[in-house]
Amino acid sequence: MTQVAAIGTYLPPWTVRERRVKGPDEDALTMAVAAGRAADPDATAHRVVLVTRDFPLLEGGNGAVLLAGLSLTADVAVSEVLGGAPAVLDQILGATDGTLVIATDDSATVTAAAAVLIGAEGAGGAGLEPVARQTRSLPTTVRAEDGTRHSYGDPRLQREIGVKSTVVRLGLADTQTVVAVVGAKARDIDAGGAIEDPNSSASGVIRALAAVIENRQAGGLLLAVEQSSVTAAKLTWDDGTQAPWIARDEAQARELPTFRTADGTGIPISLPAYARAFEPKLRWEAAVFDERPGIDTAPQFPPRARVAEDGGLVTDYRLEPLPRTGTVYTQTTIRIPVPDLPSPYSIAVIQLDGSPVRVLMKVTGVPAGEATIGQAGSVVLRKIADRAGVPDYGYAFWPETAEGGVHP
């Protein structure tokens, strides 16, 4: 049995026509990091599984950025799994103690992320065990190698053949109660009263699991449906033990502002410079030197060599994590459109909490020009720009507002 220790969820703070959408500096990977940090804020995971159908990079790798954003060391194993709702449930059911399973969606229908941290077997709380699985083929929606999407457009076929007939093949007993279903309507499988998310999505499975746990519903079945594939798992409770910890990074939604991007060529990428800056920039670390004449112990960001009192170049330093909260020291807004950067946008000098370090960062999560001097907030992973097709990730400052607090 898989033991659920903690759950984290993330929703972007923007909407378009009442549907959550990502900001221009977000993608599936930044959302995955937000959900993962919510589930595992102390960075205890020793294995990470990322499940999505919307990887930012199919070649080039997403794992290094994912681990850095989660504050996990580079020797932690990362698996990138292409799949939807059933794949997420399968990965959770097969996970071992200390595994962080992250599901993220960046599609036309769902933009969200969620994560589950697996605990030790027998630790109590909420447990999941496999019940049945059916993998069939009814490609009512397909996406080709070039990204072209085709939809057959027959909801009745999807409901009758894709969902109902596949659920029948599971052979579930009449005594087994369905408490949550993702990818189908509860009434389509005679599961009235179950928590439902008709949109099939990777993150929806974990969000449904969190809803069942929060409602303290009696144990029952969780169904994950994608087209004509279904995985069923049984949720059980160990009475008298504490429920899994659930953290939701879900700021109140606001209408997505209008952005413009100028035509032209943006700043080209230099991969040697990218490689040199990756560790301190993405791991959010500063250089700290041992005190000697001419050199103090104040953290230096970005890390760099220093000159001692005798004129010698000192390069021996250790890297220490920087705080992920701070306040706006000063700020300004750029309204002239430039290539590669959706405008307008704000930049701010952030005074990090409990540190002498001040960092120049873009502002995220609020409309341009809204951040004010002295406003507190969090440092979060964002996609700064796309340079020659390579996502250039870094950190941005998300001001704390009345609608949402500090982010992990």
Can you name each region flagged by the protein language model?
Residues 380-408:
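OB-fold/S1-family single-stranded nucleic acid-binding modules
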Residues 1-30, 108-169, 173, 216-271:
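Condensing-enzyme catalytic core mediating Claisen C-C bond formation in acyl metabolism
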Residues 22-26, 30, 54-98, 186-211:
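Conserved catalytic cysteine-centered active-site region
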Residues 364-379:
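Short nucleic-acid-contacting surface segments enriched for D/E, G, S/T with interspersed K/R
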Residues 35-47, 160-178:
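Phosphate/pyrophosphate-binding loops at sites that engage ATP/ADP/AMP, CoA/4′-phosphopantetheine
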